[in-house]
């Protein structure tokens, strides 16, 4: 129920910006990735959780105009966040950066279809987004040698596009509705 396609557009614009800006000095040495630790894991966790709480509120509150659908939006938002967290935890092998970006990947992906999907579809959407983020962030840094410091392209660009596809794919898994006679 978020602004439906803004994540994908923003992510792809960020990808273009990262390509134009180039790599940070010292990021690659002899063609190999040089590890640069995050400046503060506690601040990474705090920022992620502030975003999650705010995102949850934004998603649900933006559905208030849809009448009785806001409960479904709340459940779907939570399910996508759980799916993204679990997938990033498993695929990312307990890496704190992946663990804290996994729920955000799920949230980005569910924005397009939070009012359309069944909660199981939201869980699957979030899980695929979490795994997609881990794979794409790693490939971007290691294989393609593109220095996207925050992972904006994998998080918003790819997970946003995946969310748009999933919102169409999983719409048939809808909840039964009351018939108006």
Regions from the language model: what does each represent?
Residues 19-38, 64:
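Alpha-helical transmembrane bundle and helix-membrane interface signal
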Residues 11-19, 23, 48, 52-56, ...:
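Transmembrane alpha-helical segments of multi-pass membrane transport proteins and ion-pumping complexes
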Residues 1-3, 171-180:
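Conserved small/polar residues in nucleotide/adenosyl-binding loops
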Residues 4-12, 74, 124:
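Membrane-interface loop-to-helix entry segments
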Residues 96-104, 151:
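Cytoplasmic-side transmembrane-helix entry/capping segments in multi-pass membrane proteins
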